[in-house]
Design a protein with these regions (language model features):
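Nucleotide-activated donor-dependent transferases that construct or modify glycoconjugates
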Residues: 2-12
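A short, glycine/small-residue-rich beta-strand->loop->alpha-helix junction that serves as a flexible
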Residues: 10-19, 59-64
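Glycine-rich beta-alpha loop elements in corrinoid/cobalamin-binding modules
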Residues: 24-146
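Conserved adenine-nucleotide phosphate-binding loops and their immediately adjacent elements
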Residues: 149
Length: 149
């Protein structure tokens, strides 16, 4: 799968690498996925639907509105979206509603996004919130599988 991970552009004078997206990228590449990380503070974010299967957007509370704008823009190109980060972990269902993303990672994104990118059914992806019948639903993976790794 081809995955674009972004940290939104927001008003800040501090420019530091986004380590969380680096961890995600490394894990996804380990499983054979093509990944690009874009930092909105340093570069222009371009959404090309021919290049990406899904766009992951990180959010801290200070720039959650910018996260929502990036989700909206990615979706306008027909791209699937997943949100994650500290803001989303605090209230994944409401974050999914507010952003209108396709998915929200409610815990450690490395496992969640790797399972989703590998084609696992959303209901079986650990730590995922997704839409079902127009409402946010938390995944309910087979608990036995949690102990098999």
């Amino acid at each position: 799968m081809n995955i674009l991970l972004i940290s939104p552009k927001y008003d800040s004078y501090i420019v530091a690498p986004h380590l969380g997206l680096g961890y995600l990228s490394s894990t996804l590449k380990k499983y054979g996925h093509k990944v690009k990380v874009l930092d909105g503070l340093r570069e222009e974010i371009v959404y090309n639907p021919e290049d990406w299967d899904i766009v992951g957007v990180s959010a801290m509370s200070t720039y959650f509105p910018e996260c929502c704008k990036d989700v909206e823009k990615a979706k306008s190109y027909g791209l699937k979206t997943i949100i994650g980060g500290p803001h989303i972990i605090c209230d994944p269902e409401q974050s999914l509603i507010d952003s209108q993303a396709d998915y929200a990672a409610s815990g450690e994104g490395e496992r969640t996004l790797t399972q989703l990118a590998s084609g696992k059914e959303p209901s079986q992806v650990e730590g995922l919130v997704y839409w079902k019948d127009g409402k946010p639903k938390r995944s309910n993976p087979d608990l036995k599988s949690l102990f098999e790794q």
